């Protein structure tokens, strides 16, 4: 497993917190219903967040079309974590273009990360993250980025433990 070293890079070592029956694999079109279920659960769980609380009534139908397109896209992957064959987590990773005037020109962008409550603190996030980082490295990407809700202290601590650091804040101003 990968852990942040003191220099901010990732180092490999075993992680005894991972459940023995936990596996991570790239989702396929056959997994679309599970992907929809997990990713909508993420949005519903954060219904107090100013961005995520605005879930559209037709979100499941929109999700089906959107996530199917994402599953077919060669520049991204959706990973599923399964414990004894039951889906317990999801993570999407995209090979994303960087800013045109800055390095790196491409980076991995991690999003839509969700672990079912009963599977939390059992290494699911770390296993999903490890798969995403391996996928990024296979594509020559040397940096990973993500956004997460500022008020989610548990997620902030988890991402910090995986080597991420805050470099900017997303601000929202309602115009109506």
Locations of the language-model features?
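Conserved active-site alpha-helix within GNAT-family acetyltransferase domains
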Residues: 126, 138, 150-168
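Conserved GNAT-fold acetyl-CoA-binding loop/helix
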Residues: 40-66
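Conserved beta-strand-loop-alpha-helix junction that forms the acyl-donor binding cleft
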Residues: 145-155, 172-176
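Conserved acetyl-CoA pyrophosphate-binding loop and the N-cap/start of the following alpha-helix
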Residues: 119, 123-131
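Conserved N-terminal entry element of GNAT/NAT acetyltransferase domains
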Residues: 1-30
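Conserved beta-strand in the GNAT
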Residues: 80, 86-95, 109, 114
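Conserved GNAT acetyl-CoA-binding A-motif
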Residues: 136-147
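A short beta-loop-alpha structural element at the N-terminal edge
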Residues: 23-37, 46-48
